[in-house]
Amino acid sequence: MIHRPRYHDWSWPKGKAENGEPLVAAAVREVEEETGQVITLGAPLTTQRYRLGGGQTKEVHYWVGTPMPVGDPAVRLRAPVARAPRTEIDQTTWATPAAAADMLTRRGDRRLLADVVARAREGRLATSTIIVLRPGAADPAPIDAASAAPVGGRASAPGTSASGGTASGSAPTPGPGSVPGSSSVPTVPGGPGPLAAAPAAPTPRPAPTPAMVASAAARRAAQVERASSLTAEAAAHPADPPLGRFGVRQSFDLIDLLSAFGVGRAFTSPSARARQVLAPWAAVGGGSVTLVEALGVPVGDEAGADKDADARAGRVRAFAAQRLREQAGATLLSVTGAARDLIVEEIRAYGSSAIVGASPVSLGHGQIMVAHVEQGTDGPVVVAVETHSVTTKNPAVPTRRASRRH
């Protein structure tokens, strides 16, 4: 508990989130600033709401916290924290539940204490954490200018019309087979600018012979067959694109979220994005990452996977159930595709109807679902579910500027 000389009260440590700081990162930072204790977060407690003097409502989120040793990998990932000045916090102390109930000034803080004591007496205070992560998106595939030309057409060079004549200063109507967006005004290398020339006479073409017609038809048929085979191959072997540029930035900001919950190990599906999003966290913090083949479909084996869909779903659910039964602190699951939805569905099955209603059906890119699990006499029980997102700014997405009055 902390004592604030300005208000002459005893309360729980708390504070405001900085601009762009996730709430859970703010929670562990404020506790360290005000008490010197380095903690990781467990299950959430009741959110406190009360009115301020100006009529505004203040909302404060609380979690069960566990002190961590300074050398813990989850702690090493955090930025250094400076202690709060004595003018803000002049005393900190541990107290027994009975003494704390007498010392706490606010009634809401005493309710939080009663909640924690009740959970401890019922054996529900200690929980493990399962975190499901949806990795960031891949960058959109670049558009190849060559592939933009119609199949079988012959792309014209910039500055020439489809009939082979040189363009004048005014843009002619593009002929069939011309590249969309190509310039129709030629320039002279080293010259001052666009070349304005009189239209040249079109080059006479030889009359088509039966052999030429047959050759053109054969080329056209080969192009159509090649395009069809490429389309079928792309459908049968979906690409495994890497993490996009914005997703890479999200992977660095994800470190603060994972550190707040004390994640020390991770499991990942075989997809590139699921593995790459963990790279900064694993490299800096030294966390363990285990590749689980059962959480993905090997590229090139999609047809066989469709025939074995029920068996694959059963393996994914069994994997999730095994993680729920473990008392291993905080575990991260980085999964893409249908396997992630199956894991979320399995986690929801271990909670009450209220938990199911509060838990998300799907996750956004860079978002995590945090499930807090207690081990009951009849097996694991999900007692709380929360979602958090990285606050990475995407410069590629234009922001809406506030209008100014003149």
Predicted features along the sequence, with ranges:
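Active-site-adjacent beta-strand/loop module that shapes the phosphate/pyrophosphate-binding cleft
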Residues: 48-80, 93
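Domain-level recognition of soluble alpha/beta enzyme cores
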Residues: 351-381
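The catalytic Nudix box helix
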Residues: 12-45
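N-terminal strand-loop-strand
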Residues: 1-12, 131, 135
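A short coil-to-beta-strand element that immediately follows conserved catalytic motifs
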Residues: 38-48, 288-295
